[in-house]
A protein has these predicted regions:
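Flexible, glycine/small-residue-enriched loop-and-beta-strand segment within the central core
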Residues: 1-60, 86-87
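Outer-envelope exported proteins of Gram-negative bacteria
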Residues: 5-7, 11, 64-70, 80
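C-terminal end-helix/capping segment
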Residues: 77, 81-87
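Beta-rich strand-turn-strand
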Residues: 51-66, 71-75
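Short-chain dehydrogenase/reductase
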Residues: 48, 66, 82-84
Length: 87
C-alpha cells in the first residue's frame, strides 16, 4: 500500500498512514457502515520527506518534491512542489 519511487529520501519519524483507525469509533452505527478510510500512498522520484512528516491515506506526492518537517499531508502534492504545514 506504500510505493516509493527511485531516489526518495526519508528523514526520521516519517509516518505513512494507509488506513484511518478513527472510523472504528462509529463502526457500530449503521448510518456510517460504509465509511472506510484507507488508500495507497505513492511518493514520486527524487523527493525528500522531512522529519516527523505524516502522510495520510490515498495521497500521491509527485516527482522532485520537498515535504517540510512536521507536515501533515492530507491531499495530493503536484510535481516540483515544496509543501509545509498541513498542505
Amino acid at each position: 500500500m506504500i510505493e516509493l519511487a527511485d531516489n526518495v529520501r526519508l528523514s526520521f519519524n516519517v509516518t505513512f498512514v494507509t488506513h484511518d483507525g478513527g472510523t472504528w469509533a462509529f463502526r457500530d452505527n449503521k448510518r456510517y457502515a460504509d465509511v472506510i478510510r484507507y488508500g495507497k500512498i505513492y511518493v514520486g522520484e527524487h523527493t525528500f520527506i522531512g522529519t516527523g512528516v505524516i502522510i495520510m491515506p490515498g495521497v500521491t506526492i509527485g516527482k522532485r518534491c520537498v515535504i517540510g518537517a512536521g507536515a501533515v499531508v492530507t491531499r495530493d502534492i503536484p510535481d516540483n512542489s515544496v509543501a509545509v504545514g498541513v498542505p
